[in-house]
UniProtKB/Swiss-Prot annotation:
Belongs to the actin family. ARP3 subfamily. It is found in: Cytoplasm, Cytoskeleton. GO terms for molecular function: actin binding; ATP binding. Functions as ATP-binding component of the Arp2/3 complex which is involved in regulation of actin polymerization and together with an activating nucleation-promoting factor (NPF) mediates the formation of branched actin networks. Seems to contact the pointed end of the daughter actin filament. Regulates the directionality of cell expansion by regulating the actin organization, and thus the microtubules distribution and the fusion of small vacuoles. One of its GO terms (cellular component) is Arp2/3 protein complex. Its main location: cytoplasm. This is Actin-related protein 3. Gene3D superfamilies: 3.30.420.40, Actin, Chain A, domain 4 (3.90.640.10). Component of the Arp2/3 complex. PANTHER family: ACTIN. Keywords: Actin-binding, ATP-binding, Cytoplasm, Cytoskeleton, Developmental protein, Nucleotide-binding. GO terms for biological process: Arp2/3 complex-mediated actin nucleation. The keyword Cytoplasm applies. It comes from Oryza sativa subsp. japonica.
């Protein structure tokens, strides 16, 4: 059976989580933390045997070290239950930093999770914007040399998110993608499927920062949460209880007037003693997401709100694309799922745009009148997995297999072919 007749494998590697599955599905088959636990016992034996000159023992220890590792939730569980396993995070701020660990991670994803033969499927992998071309070469080498895949396409995450966020029968591949990940936040303008690289903006406020801010607030308030559980509790509070408010002062007053209505209660069990503990969740519910709109409450070194960064991103784009960009601002990532996040972002951004139009009309003095600009922030139910879903849809088209780099091309031209990946018009 030809590999092109089988569904392609779609893997979206993020800093915090990896989404994996097969093209044509609505949701990924597996979502797992991007982390690897490696047994340091065998690594220590390898070093000791090298010193003693015992090469056979060194080889055996090296083989065991290559086999004894876990990924995802299994890795986190192993690190908690045993001191011999150390955690390694291969991706930092959206970029791969440890290729050996990344290869191990992919190995487990393909064989233990998806349980497929990589030689029988084309692969679509994702990358963050501004990824250097050398990274694509390393990815191509691993995929073609180690896993012997028949075809590979490396897609830019914002383009896939834009493909997932279309709201009409025609997929508009012009828009701005606000991608808030666990380790990186990018604002990326895209015109006709091509990223406008010179206008990309990044901010040092991510989903992990929201979690850490909630963790900090709970600690300062004196809630009795076990230290080893505090980050995980803060993450769950973020996902379950947080929302975006329209006015932070009014929200404080509402909580003070009716605490029983707005305060939530969290209960858990201490892992060491088994005793129960409880804590109250109050201001943290709206203060967590607020750092995107008032970052100074969390980080004194960065004080530019998200909507201002988006406006600067669009204003630095070619003038003939700006109206289309304002009209299609697509959210992507789990930390954009807060209730009313898209409404708050659209309101604050529209204030800036309307003020600019009024100032332009005042300068013209009535001789001409600037046309109003439509601002639209797109929110949809699958924006948490928007990048993966966009990859799933695009990898389901016939054009995908034509755009992939094949193993034969890799053997003829080398890894340099992976430096560029053509934009294909599969949906528009």
């Amino acid at each position: 059976m030809d590999a092109a007749s089988r569904p392609a494998v779609v893997i979206d590697n993020g800093t915090g989580y990896t989404k994996m599955g097969f093209a044509g599905n609505v949701e990924p088959c597996f979502i797992t933390p991007t982390v690897v636990a490696v047994n340091d016992t065998f690594a220590g034996q390898t070093r000791a045997n090298t010193t003693k000159g015992n090469w056979m023992a060194q080889h055996s220890a090296g083989v065991m070290a290559d086999l004894d590792f876990f990924i995802g939730e299994d890795a986190l569980a192993r690190s908690r239950s045993s001191n011999t396993y150390n955690l390694s995070y291969p991706i930092h701020n959206g970029q791969v930093e440890n290729w050996d660990t990344m290869e191990r991670f992919w190995q487990q994803c393909i064989f233990n999770y998806l349980r497929c033969d990589p030689e029988d499927h084309y692969f679509l992998l994702t990358e963050s914007p501004l990824t250097p071309p050398e990274t694509r070469e390393y990815t191509g080498e691993i995929m073609f040399e180690t896993f012997n895949v028949p075809g590979l396409y490396i897609a830019c995450q914002p383009v896939l998110a834009l493909a997932a966020g279309y709201t009409t029968t025609k997929c508009e591949m012009t828009g701005v993608v606000v991608d808030v990940g666990d380790g990186a936040t990018h604002i990326v303008p895209v015109a006709d499927g091509y990223v406008i690289g010179s206008s990309i903006r990044s901010i040092p406020i991510t989903g992990k920062d929201v979690t850490q801010f909630i963790q900090q607030l709970l600690k300062e308030r004196g809630e009795h949460i076990p230290p080893e559980e505090s980050f995980d509790v803060a993450r769950r509070v973020k996902e379950m209880y947080c929302y975006t408010c329209s006015d932070i002062v009014k929200e404080f007053n509402k909580h003070d007037r009716e605490p029983n209505k707005y305060i939530k209660h969290w209960s858990g069990i201490k892992p060491k003693t088994g005793a129960k503990y409880t804590c109250d969740i109050g201001y943290e519910r709206f203060l967590g997401p607020e750092i995107f709109f008032h970052p100074e409450i969390y980080n004194n070194d960065f004080t530019t709100p998200l909507h201002v960064v988006i406006d600067k991103c669009i204003q630095s784009s070619p003038i003939d694309t700006r109206r289309a960009l304002y009209k299609n601002i697509v959210l992507s990532g789990g930390s954009t799922m807060f209730k009313d996040f898209h409404r708050r972002l659209q309101r604050d951004l529209k204030k800036i745009v309307d003020a600019r139009v009024l100032a332009s009309n005042a300068r013209l003095g009535g001789d001409a009148k600037a046309q109003p600009i439509e601002v639209n922030v797109v929110s949809h139910p699958i924006q948490r997995y928007a990048v993966w879903f966009g990859g799933s849809v695009l990898a389901s088209t016939a054009e995908f297999y034509e755009a992939c780099h094949t193993k034969a091309e890799y053997e003829e031209y080398g890894a340099s072919i992976c430096r560029t990946n053509p934009v294909f018009k599969g949906m528009y």
